[in-house]
Amino acid sequence: IIGARVAGISAVQASGQPGADNASLSIRGQSGIIYVIDGIRRSASDFNGLDPNEIESVSVLKDASAVAVYGLDANGAFIVTTKKGQTDKVTISYTGTVGISQNAEEQEWLDGPEYAYWYNKARLLQGDTEVFTVDMVRKMREGVDGWGNTNWYDKVYGTGVRQHHNISASGGSEKIRFFTSIGYLEEKGNIDKFKYRRMNLRSNIDAQLAKGLSLSLGVSGRIEKRDAPKFSADPDDWMNIPQQVCYALPYVQDTYEYNGKIYDVSTPTSGSPVAPIASIYDSGYNRSNQSYMQSNFSLKYDTPWLKGLSLKFQGAYDLVHGMTKQLTKPNEVMIMDLPNAATTTLTYHKDYSVLKDTPILSESASRAQEFTTQTSITYDNKFGDHSIGVLLLAETRERNSNNLGVTGTGLDFIQLDELNQITGFTKEGKEQPAIPSGSSSQTRVAGFVGRLNYNYADKYYLEASLRHDGSYLFGGMNKRWVTLPGLSLAWRINNEKWFHATWVDNLKLRAGIGKTATSGIQPFQWRNTMSTSPNSVVIGGASQTAIYPSVLGNPNLTWAQCL
């Protein structure tokens, strides 16, 4: 929606999976967009996770002079303000929508006989013998002797259902105002077994504590749950289900009976065999559960001794917990044997799918917390036709995260899919101990901002800004900090006395220049990377592990700057 309504914004949707269809936004072809929600910088996932009913307004900053004040990696900015309570009686609102989702354009596929016709044509052009005979084509239409006529597209794709509900309450008095919102979103994909659920909660409270002293407190949270088969629908993933639909051959049946049991059919390709139906229902699962809590606190004091002078402190604390669980489930399929010129009856052989014959269970957990502080002084006043605004701000951001996970092989009972049931052995009896993993990280950035706004008679505008940013990504005081200036001039033509076009209510000419900076590197590349090598040296008659610099650091790394 934003991409269609705001000039210079392009949106590219790379996936249609429930809960993963967020568009990638760019401004005038440039990435590096930041998102500021209620004055605090947030991630793209936080922006995408907002309930639309919580949003009061969205502003877009597109040029360098406007975003220079936001510093690190800011080539453009979305400024989001969430709803606040009004001085009025309590109002309760409900909105709800239910819709369906289908592929925008139904693809046309060759059926079995058509595939046979064009395959034979290609063989003849190469000087080879035809493979498919008239009798084979007849059997495809009749579905006998192992032949079939399956439209895998119709078998896999259906109709998804999307529902969204929100209830909110707002109100207040001169002293205190509130806004509270609860939302629920559920999406079921047009491929079965894909499901996304999200619950949003937001509460904003604004209070006048004393004359000139105001308090704002915002608390929000959301829970996101995703369910999918082990094979995803992401176009970048190996053996994704839409890809399997494209590769599956149409002249087979979708199921095959063998020794009194019904199996899903798999067809060979130039790589691994594909079995779209089995990949949806029998490959296992991929589940995730993410919990987000965000708080925003600000205290503002309008000084009585100087009109227009305000002091403000704003802080935010974010906490994220994540859990994922993946089960790779072995499943048997009937793999079709490719026909040749001597084939009369299409044959199949029973084997495990591409996921092999041993179950694999993986679980991981993550935790991240982020602290943001902003201390600012602002001055806004008007002297006749002259308006002036000054901002001085200091900002810090710190993020700490931890991740751990375990992958185990072998389960005696696939229904008991818990890590304490892992056997550590493959079906053939080969030992494969559980593999643990873990990591942690810490990031810190700081910045100082100065900005001057001036306008004369609401016709001529000047804005100048200067930001001094520091990042943990670079070493040494000479490389860690960067200074980012910005300057813009504007002329509101429609406010001139000689402008009489009443049908134009806002005509503005603006020019700006500014410097932005991006990091674009992994942490600690300014230091040497040390690696270990076992059994590299002998000390005291015993082999020892050696430590050596595998990658030399570059102490001269610094910000990539753009004017």
What are these model-derived regions, one by one?
Residues 4-5, 38-68:
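Short acidic/polar hinge/loop motifs at secondary-structure boundaries
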Residues 13, 27-31, 62, 82-84, ...:
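Flexible glycine-/small-residue-rich
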Residues 163, 198, 204-213, 218-223, ...:
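Extracellular/periplasmic, surface-exposed regions of secreted and cell-surface proteins
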